[in-house]
């Protein structure tokens, strides 16, 4: 089963609101006056300003825009990967109340049919155990622990636009890029932003070219023989340690 992600809704007048955040720190006028000017400026002019502000590194203005997403029939692995992003809100179809034996599952691309058959037989067996436990009176909230992480999940997710840019890049270029399902979700979000919110389609592949996906570490942190200097220590350190056990 192939899952997908959809942008459901965005803050009203998103470009005008973000552009207002970019204007207020340098433009004369009250907050209401600046917002009115942004509305009057129009989409094209606001998007041009947003691009200029973002290119200067002031990405916090994106936080004035909120985006609501739906994830349909994605794996629980994808669900849990996304829930790691704590600057977002999630509401997930509950495994405590809904029956998931017929939820379907996401199957990886296998190099041969034998591996695929073993995988699918194993998953179907786990679904069968889940059904058997429920039929035996085991509560759903306990039976759910035998479900595989590939079974399909559905949930809503809301986050500010700055976090969305971060999430899209993590999916397309960061840790998520190693898993085809996650990389596909990231590319889908970028494609939707390019159509609906072009100022959010900010790709940052260069940020992930380091081996660990972060900025280069200082050389001294990578050197195992780097010197360590003891700045201070108690006079009788050994005595203090021994007294703690007497």
Where are these regions (language model features)?
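A conserved ligand/cofactor-binding region detector
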Residues: 1-246
């Amino acid at each position: 089963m192939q899952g997908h992600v959809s942008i459901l809704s965005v803050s009203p007048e998103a470009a005008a609101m973000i552009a207002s955040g970019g204007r207020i720190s340098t433009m004369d006028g009250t907050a209401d006056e600046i917002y009115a000017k942004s509305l009057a400026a129009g989409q094209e002019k606001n998007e041009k300003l947003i691009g200029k502000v973002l290119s200067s590194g002031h990405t916090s203005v994106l936080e004035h825009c909120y985006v609501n997403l739906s994830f349909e029939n994605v794996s629980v692995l994808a669900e849990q990967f996304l829930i790691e992003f704590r600057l977002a809100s999630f509401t997930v179809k509950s495994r405590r109340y809904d029956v998931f034996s017929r939820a379907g599952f996401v199957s990886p691309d296998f190099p041969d049919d034998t591996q695929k058959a073993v995988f699918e037989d194993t998953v179907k067996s786990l679904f069968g155990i889940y059904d058997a436990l429920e039929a035996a009176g085991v509560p759903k909230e306990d039976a759910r622990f035998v479900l595989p992480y590939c079974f399909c999940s559905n949930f809503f997710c809301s986050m500010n636009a700055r976090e969305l840019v971060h999430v899209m890049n993590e999916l397309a270029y960061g840790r998520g890029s190693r898993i085809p399902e996650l990389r596909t979700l990231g590319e889908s979000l970028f494609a939707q932003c390019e159509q609906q919110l072009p100022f959010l389609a900010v790709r940052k592949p260069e940020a992930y070219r380091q081996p660990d996906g972060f900025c280069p570490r200082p050389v001294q942190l990578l050197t195992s023989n780097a010197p360590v200097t003891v700045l201070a220590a108690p006079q009788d350190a050994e005595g203090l340690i021994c007294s703690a056990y007497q």
